[in-house]
């Protein structure tokens, strides 16, 4: 029996990432981005905005993140997409709607494209809780970067041998695509 698991021993320099960041609550999202970049850099990824491994895409807020994440994943130029945002509860139900739709949209982007899309949207009751999760006590941005590295590695291992086949063939008739590989 074969065991598949994401690892960090492969050639990291060949991996490409897109990071989609919500600008709203940027006091928090800037810190999440820093933590994510720190993780990727320590694992050998060139996080320079002028480099070839990471593209940064800023959107107005967490509600817009899933649409852009899906579009980016559909391009199949990236091994993983990392979504960063912060939704902080207010005094209206708005929080519930935005948080639910962001979560559903990010999951749908991954399922519909086959590209790992990491859910890095903080949903907290207070700004203090968000800041604690973005750097005061720990920085979950680091965890989101690590998840992206692991999932990118795992998905590379799970690719069909004939990855040069058109995606439509793999999706519509995976059995035939594997036999032709």
Swiss-Prot record:
Pathway(s) it belongs to: Cofactor biosynthesis; riboflavin biosynthesis; riboflavin from 2-hydroxy-3-oxobutyl phosphate and 5-amino-6-(D-ribitylamino)uracil: step 1/2
Residues noted as binding 5-amino-6-(D-ribitylamino)uracil in the record, renumbered to the chain: 24, 62-64, 86-88, 119
Pfam families assigned to the protein according to its UniProt record, in alphabetical order: DMRL_synthase
Any one GO cellular component localisation term in the record: riboflavin synthase complex
Record's catalysed reaction(s): (2S)-2-hydroxy-3-oxobutyl phosphate + 5-amino-6-(D-ribitylamino)uracil = 6,7-dimethyl-8-(1-D-ribityl)lumazine + phosphate + 2 H2O + H(+)
Keyword Transferase: yes
Positions of the catalytic residues: 94
Domain of life: Bacteria
Binding site for (2S)-2-hydroxy-3-oxobutyl phosphate: 91-92, 133
CDD domains from the UniProt entry: Lumazine_synthase-I
Biological processes annotated in GO: riboflavin biosynthetic process
Entry EC number(s): 2.5.1.78
Molecular function GO labels: 6,7-dimethyl-8-ribityllumazine synthase activity
Assigned keywords, A-Z: Riboflavin biosynthesis, Transferase
Family from the record: Belongs to the DMRL synthase family.
NCBIfam families per the UniProt record, alphabetical: lumazine-synth
Stored PANTHER family: 6,7-DIMETHYL-8-RIBITYLLUMAZINE SYNTHASE, 6,7-DIMETHYL-8-RIBITYLLUMAZINE SYNTHASE DMRL SYNTHASE LUMAZINE SYNTHASE
Function field: Catalyzes the formation of 6,7-dimethyl-8-ribityllumazine by condensation of 5-amino-6-(D-ribitylamino)uracil with 3,4-dihydroxy-2-butanone 4-phosphate. This is the penultimate step in the biosynthesis of riboflavin.
Protein name, per record: 6,7-dimethyl-8-ribityllumazine synthase
